[in-house]
Amino acid sequence: MESMLNKLKSTVTKVTADVTSAVMGNPVTREFDVGRHIASGGNGLAWKIFNGTKKSTKQEVAVFVFDKKLIDKYQKFEKDQIIDSLKRGVQQLTRLRHPRLLTVQHPLEESRDCLAFCTEPVFASLANVLGNWENLPSSISPDIKDYKLYDVETKYGLLQVSEGLSFLHSSVKMVHGNVTPENVILNKSGAWKIMGFDFCVSSSNPSEQEPKFPCKEWDPNLPSLCLPNPEYLAPEYILSVSCETASDMYSLGAVMYAVFNQGRPIFEVNKQDIYKSFSRQLDQLSRLGSSSLTSIPEEVREHVKLLLNVTPTVRPDADQMTKIPFFDDVGAVTLQYFDTLFQRDNLQKSQFFKGLPKVLPKLPKRVIVQRILPCLTSEFVNPDMVPFVLPNVLLIAEECTKEEYIKLILPELGPVFKQQEPIQILLIFLQKMDLLLTKTPPDEIKNSVLPMVYRALEAPSIQIQELCLNIIPTFANLIDYPSMKNALIPRIKNACLQTSSLAVRVNSLVCLGKILEYLDKWFVLDDILPFLQQIPSKEPAVLMGILGIYKCTFTHKKLGITKEQLAGKVLPHLIPLSIENNLNLNQFSSFIAVIKEMLSRLESEHRTKLEQLHVMQEQQRSLDIGNQMSTSEETKVAHSGSQQIDKVFNNIGADLLSGSESENREDGMQGKQKRGSLTLEEKQKLAKEQEQAQKLKSQQPLKPQVHTPIAPIKQTKDLTDTLMENMSSLTSLSVSTPKISASSTFTPVPSTGLGMMFSTPIDNTKRNLTNGLNANMGFQTSGFSMPVNPNQNFFSGTGTAGVTTMSLGAPPTMSNFSPLTIPPASVKQPQQRPTDMSALNNLFGPQKPKVSMNQLSQQKPNQWLNQFAPPQGSPVMGSAAMGTQGNVMGQAAFGMQGNPFFNPQNFAQPPPTTMTSSSSASNDLKDLFG
């Protein structure tokens, strides 16, 4: 890779050095910038041809440079001869002006190192094209290397050379003297032009007389650049030292032979023995037959044979050659007409341009682009000719690539886009709009092409508007969306609303209907459909156009009309239009069919929506019910603790002792009945208790209330004395007062993490049993209003002097807690003064009146207390021991295991022991209650 770059660098450096050394110091460089070496030409291909530009005008030129280093091998006088010959040829060319002669734009300039002059832009010499690459750069351009002449180029090129010779012979009275492929130059447009007048001979006779051309004898001692090319020189020039116009015609025949024979001349000449070679050549020419000219086309073969005739008078002259049938080819005639176009009037031009589209497809693209297109675009300056020239230019543009179109055609069309007269220009552009939008760059479309379309829509001519509206749908897909939305559509709508022509209005609606597919759905709904309601006319064609737009929008997959639009705007507009009196039966049927289709879809879509909403509502309703149930359960669980605590402590006097299951109470009642019948008073109290339980059951659950603790009043109170007094009062109960035994069961209470102190007198002693509860915690006591006897002992039967001990049932073991036990009777407790129990009155709130055990056992279960009751059928505690003889009944101890507040996780209680009847206890009750 590096070696390739170095090679390329050296090549570029060498070429630059060659150019610099070739023209350095030459006055030509003051006015022209010399570019790349592209070709070679002139006698012996001694002139190097460079492309260049004029500094002042940036006009493209060709710079011919002769480097004097080429003749360093010659003697000074020989160098001078060569330089003089070259100068003479350029000076003669500069004086002559003809379309078939190379045009000189800057005369010859000489410097110490070179000769240089400038001409019209040049492609190459005919010798280069035919394969002679002498004096060309080492890297030959592919344009020259791969160049192949088309038949039309060859025909018209030879015709041009013939016309050039005709001009020299007839008008100038001059013999060229060296007509060779090296002296035929192909310019940038492909035209063949003559140069190399180094050996031209002018007539020595006055113009009114027969021309006579003096001839110099061939001097083999002169340098080759001082002699014409003998391979194309007529035999008489060497053998008889005569020169006339027929000599140039022989040279033309030799050139024609070389063109059709891949650049090889008809005879090879030995320059060392020129006379012998020409003598042999003369014999061959005299016997020249058609078999020797097989490479030449048959239609021109005889004419070439005549041109190569040894007798000069037999050869056709230049004017005759221009008229041979070989040059009557349609392509050659067309190119010839273009070369003489400036001589024609507008009528002749218009007739020629009308027939040109039939000829263009027969011509090669290179010929069209190089020769015809420049001639056509040059006529754009003539407005009257534009309608005739423009179709041909656009036809050529179709065959060009996008790059060629942008480079060669678009710059010439720019001024034409802005021409409004004649009106045919606009029509032609509209008909070829798809071509323009396809090959024109977006910026030029926005700046040049679309403004022309907008002018057509706003043109006063109805025909122009109709044509524009008919053509727009054919290229709508090529227009960018912003331009269509913001510029094209508003002008179409404006043309529809403001025109007085029914045809324009209908065509506007048809145009809109055809370009709907290129528009956005919401733009159609918000802009196009409301516009339809603004159209004032009610002609059937207009109404059907409106219906067509509605139907196209409604049925198109990309567009569609929402049900809101259908119900609110479309149907209210279509239904009144459907009953217009101007509509016939078929048109009315079309309206009704579209309306029914819209109604059907409206019904289907809205029904589907409502069904979906209904399903969603049902699903949401079921979810809401589930959420409410779960919320209710969570609320119950959340409030159960506080509600249960309130109920337990508000009913601590009664509910705490009657919290067993209903089945357990029935078992207790059956046990009571087995032991004996209830008294009337007990039955009354039991009935009241049942009524109270019924009220409690029907009462709404309590909600916890925020309780603001009240600051304790600093007051000294002797709790010990109060407790001792209450304890002493328990021993002095009268016989007529009903005594209540301990509850057969104890209902657990759920723990809330709070503590409370309970003190119980046993054996007439003040004894503290602590279960770990905090006595300072207050509870709301307004939940229940059942009376509690303030003198009741909650953990044993009524206090009597005969009670000596209590049997405590051992409940199941609970983790982290041990059961509370009561010391046996054998342990003598210290005697203390009676305990004042008034403090408990304040602690437990309002007390309830005493009730019997049977009444408590008949109480209906409470839905909250049942949570703390032992399971159905579980054993219950025994009744308290009574009597002075010390009869003792076992009962479950109220300890830490029996307290539900110490087991907040679950409320399952150990199975209580079954109550056993005692005959002594029954007798004591009979004595106690009469």
UniProtKB/Swiss-Prot annotation:
Posttranslational mods: Could autophosphorylate in presence of poly-L-lysine.
SMART domains referenced in this protein's UniProt entry, alphabetically: S_TKc
An example Gene Ontology biological process: receptor internalization
Family matches, as Pfam families: Pkinase
GO cellular component: clathrin-coated vesicle; endosome membrane; Golgi apparatus
Stored InterPro entries: ARM-like, ARM-type_fold, CIK-Related_Protein, Kinase-like_dom_sf, Prot_kinase_dom
Signal sequence annotation: none
PROSITE patterns listed in its UniProt record: PROTEIN_KINASE_DOM (PS50011)
GO molecular function, one term: signaling receptor binding
Subcellular location: Cytoplasmic vesicle, Clathrin-coated vesicle; Golgi apparatus, trans-Golgi network membrane; Endosome membrane
Tissue note: Ubiquitously expressed.
Modified residues (Phosphoserine): 658, 677
Residue span(s) of domain Protein kinase: 32-327
Mutant lacking the gene: phenotype: Disruption of the gene results in perinatal lethality due to impaired neuronal functions. Mutant animals that survive to adulthood show growth retardation and severe sensorimotor deficits. The neurologic deficits in these mice is associated with the degeneration of several neuronal populations, most notably CA3 pyramidal neurons of the hippocampus, resulting from excitotoxicity. This is associated with excessive expression and activation of calcium-permeable glutamate receptors at the synapse.
HEAT repeats (start-end): 443-479
Coiled-coil annotated residue ranges, if any: none
Identification of the protein by name: SCY1-like protein 2
Organism: Mus musculus (Mouse)
Underlying gene: Scyl2
